[in-house]
Every structure is written in C-alpha cells, then in structure tokens.
C-alpha cells in the first residue's frame, strides 16, 4: 500500500529519502522483486547518487543467460548483493534449481567476491534441500532469508531455522508486504 501523497504510483529514491529523513533513518536496503521488473539501471543510478544511504541488490534474468556472467557484470557495475525471488523460479513449464551446476558456480563466485545473497524461498519446503546445499557448499556466503521466511506460507519455520547456520540471517522487510491488508502495526504479524 502506498501512502496517499504518492499520487503517481512512483516511490522514487528522493521521495523515499525525504521519508527516511523525516523518520530519522540513516540508511536503507533495496531488494528487487521480479514482479516489478528488473531495475538494475535505476538502482545503479541511486547507488551512485546516494551510496551512503542505500545498499542496493542487483537482479538478473534467471531463465535466460549464464548466471555467472550476469552476476560478474552486476559486480562490475558496483552491485555487492544479488536478490533472488526463489519462489518465482518454480513455474508450470520450467524451474531453476538453486543447486543446479550453473547456480552453484554463481553462488561460489558471490562467496569469493564477498557479495550478499537476499533470497525468498518457496512454501512447503520446495527449495529447502537446495538452499541447504548452497549453505553447505558456500559457508562464507552471507545469505539473508527474505520476508521472515515467508511467514504466511506453510513451512516458514524451517526457513527460520536456516539462521542456525553461520552467515545465514533472516530479514523482516517483507512483513509490510505479507500483511499489507492490515496496515501498521500489523497486529497478526
């Protein structure tokens, strides 16, 4: 839900910064979502203009091209984190497995470069074995499990338990999205 003062549907970096200043928030993390489209060009500009205020995650085309090449290119553009909406990698006609050879090579590249992975996982344990393999193979890769483990979906508790591993964290930024019908203070969250 957008605040009423955003009349054109665009929450630009400048509008967001004004709200951050008003709320006395020093910095923010921007994680992309596939439903909004890949926004690397805009976020690269935001990162350049407001590097001290925003940490931005890049995103790539998961269904086309080499994950390694795309992440190398994003790293070259200054992105130090990659967002993967894992729950959107499972389609009726195709699927990208997190532990496929191409994806594992990409995760190892991210680990070597000191990048951060922000990932949302599918419900019902569909990707748990895959992400556990990533965690085991890339123990130095910093991983943020998104949307508090997709707390409104079955199997979220197992996602939270992943934080028992070194360098695996849980972020709660998606609470406002998952509980958007309630509005602040999100009583059932």
Label every PLM stretch briefly.
Residues 81, 96-189:
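Catalytic pocket-lining loop regions of alpha/beta-barrel enzymes
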Residues 1-105, 109-113, 153, 162:
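Mid-domain alpha/beta scaffold segments of enzyme catalytic cores
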């Amino acid at each position: 839900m957008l605040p009423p003062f955003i009349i054109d549907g665009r929450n630009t970096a400048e509008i967001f910064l004004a709200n951050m200043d008003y709320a006395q928030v020093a910095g923010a993390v921007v994680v992309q979502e596939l439903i909004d489209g890949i926004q690397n060009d805009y976020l690269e500009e935001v990162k350049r203009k407001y590097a001290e205020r925003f940490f931005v995650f890049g995103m790539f085309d998961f269904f086309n091209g080499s994950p390694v090449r795309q992440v190398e290119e994003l790293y070259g553009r200054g992105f130090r984190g990659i967002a993967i909406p894992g729950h959107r990698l499972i389609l009726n006609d195709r699927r990208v497995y997190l532990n496929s050879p191409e994806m594992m090579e990409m995760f190892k590249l991210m680990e070597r470069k000191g990048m951060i992975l922000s990932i949302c996982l599918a419900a019902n344990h569909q990707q748990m074995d895959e992400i556990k393999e990533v965690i085991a193979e890339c123990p130095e890769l910093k991983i943020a499990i998104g949307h508090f483990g997709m707390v409104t979906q079955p199997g979220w508790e197992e996602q939270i338990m992943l934080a028992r591993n070194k360098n695996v964290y849980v972020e709660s930024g998606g609470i406002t999205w998952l509980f958007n019908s309630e509005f602040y203070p999100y009583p059932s969250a």
